[in-house]
Amino acid sequence: MTAHRDAIRTARSLVVKVGTNALTTPAGVFDAGRLAGLADAIEARMKAGTDVVIVSSGAIAAGIEPLGLSRRPRDLATKQAAASVGQVALVNSWSAAFARYGRTVGQVLLSAHDISMRAQHTNAQRTLDRLRALHAVAIVNENDTVATNEIRFGDNDRLSALVAHLVGAEALVLLSDIDGLYDSDPRKTKGAKFIPEVTGAEDLAGVVAGPGSDLGTGGMTSKMSSALLAADAGVPVLLAAAADAASALTDASVGTVFAARPVRMSARRFWVRYAAEAAGALTLDEGAVRAVVHQRRSLLPAGITAVSGRFYAGDVVELRGPDAVPVARGVVAYDATELATMMGRSTSELPGELRRPAVHADDLVAV
């Protein structure tokens, strides 16, 4: 067993993401029995001393049959109605499954807004931490019923990566109907090559990933992207089939493992890089790009050539090179209107109260 798999096996805290297809029959019907089987595997890991947070998809699928729908809805309003009905069935099923072991579950519904706003982000972290301290099993899902756009987290793949860092998990396990990463879809391509371990971008050369299924939204593209996000932040990831949950959670001997970067990203830098929504953008000249990206220096107003968006001091903004390609993200120190009058000007030309960097190096993350 490699050191990367060993990191999954020995992790003292896990986030386990359960995909929609792991909770439904081949006919697309929500199956509480499948959920109970996964709960058994998760319970075994918890009994061994590991703290587990569950990110569970399946609310929309669980609402299809009770509402008399013939298939997963396509429009947002019906998706939200199905999620509203299905979330009740979903969390009740998790509650019943863990009640067999004397455990209590807590439901945590998050939206992209909750993750992107620093105050809500911190409150969500506190809630999850308190649930764990009280020995309740947190069941996290996207709050589909209040979403203003189409479901965005990719069947919760991205959400699970964000939650893993949010709670300080030592590993993330993605369980679905896919037994790991291949260079192409093994269901469509004969001889597709299985990739047991991803340690760098070179391992993904030539990989062709596909979209999600009719019941779920998270295809291999979503899973791969989310796994790389978590790994880049310092959280090792195991992608495995739900049918292999017992092995995945016991010894990590199945699936594809994504190796984590050696040094875990700080909570603040992770939020800036991955969770926060950019409120605007700053275009930089070549010299400023070199200073920010390669020399890890603060961004000064002199290096800014354009300001776009409506943002305020403390917001996260995207930093772009002269070619408009994003090069970094950071917390801006000035409002957009204020910065527009400062850009391109030397610090010595500015009043004393405006001589702070536009974005301090401590609040910058290269992308």
Swiss-Prot record:
> Any idea where the PUA domain is?
279-357
GO CC terms in record: cytosol
Database matches in InterPro entries: AceGlu_kinase-like_sf (IPR036393), Asp/Glu/Uridylate_kinase (IPR001048), G5K_ProB (IPR041739), Glu/AcGlu_kinase (IPR001057), Glu_5kinase (IPR011529), Glu_5kinase/COase_Synthase (IPR005715), Glutamate_5-kinase_CS (IPR019797), PUA (IPR002478)
Q: Which domain of life is it from?
A: Bacteria
Q: What molecular functions are annotated in GO for this chain?
A: ATP binding; glutamate 5-kinase activity; RNA binding
User: Could you say which residues bind ATP here?
Assistant: K17, S176, D177, T217, G218, G219, M220, T221, S222, K223
Q: Where in the cell is it found?
A: Cytoplasm
Q: Which UniProt keywords apply?
A: Amino-acid biosynthesis, ATP-binding, Cytoplasm, Kinase, Nucleotide-binding, Proline biosynthesis, Transferase
Q: What is its EC number?
A: 2.7.2.11
CDD domains in the record: AAK_G5K_ProB, PUA_G5K
The Gene Ontology biological process terms listed for this entry are:
L-proline biosynthetic process
Q: What is its main location?
A: cytoplasm
Q: Which residues form a coiled coil?
A: none
Q: Where does substrate bind?
A: S57, D144, N156
Look up the record and name the pathway of this protein: Amino-acid biosynthesis; L-proline biosynthesis; L-glutamate 5-semialdehyde from L-glutamate: step 1/2
Q: Which reaction does it catalyse?
A: L-glutamate + ATP = L-glutamyl 5-phosphate + ADP
Q: What is the documented function of this protein?
A: Catalyzes the transfer of a phosphate group to glutamate to form L-glutamate 5-phosphate.
- Similarity field: Belongs to the glutamate 5-kinase family.
| Protein name (Swiss-Prot/TrEMBL) | Glutamate 5-kinase
Lineage, top ranks: Bacteria, Bacillati, Actinomycetota, Actinomycetes, Mycobacteriales
Gene, per the UniProt record:
proB
